[in-house]
Amino acid sequence: MDEQHKLSVIHKLLHDTVHLRGIRTPRQHARFKNSGVQELYDGETRDDIAERKEIGEDEDIYAWMYSEELADNIFMEAQSNALITRMDIRGEQALNDAHAQVGREVRQTIARLNGTMPEDLPTPKKSIHQLEEEEKRRRTKGMDLFPELDEPDTPPETP
């Protein structure tokens, strides 16, 4: 399972967890997400990250991250989910505070390990979606170059 898929699964799990505990509206979910992100990214919101990375409004910021930055976010979200579940945290403010605490602690861990802070990591020149599309086109073109590879193995006909 690649990092993008892991993050997608963890996003859904965390979304469902906090939804059951009091984060219900899209605006509440946005505030919740930003509470952790702002601690992990030294005050930057998701919109700030998108602006810094120069990506469009409708684009997924996570599609514009290399694996180290994705791993930082996966770890934060997985640990937030675990803490919220383990401590049975409920209510919007308590959930936001818990997510912020985990984001802050992940950032402190990166610092202790002399790691690169997420906001200082490079941004790929192309999103994962663009790379996947290019790979799909390459495969399609490659198949056209070798049509015999598309034919099923059948024994030659005998007269």
PLM region spans:
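Positively charged, phosphate-engaging catalytic surfaces used for nucleic-acid and nucleotide handling
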Residues: 1-159
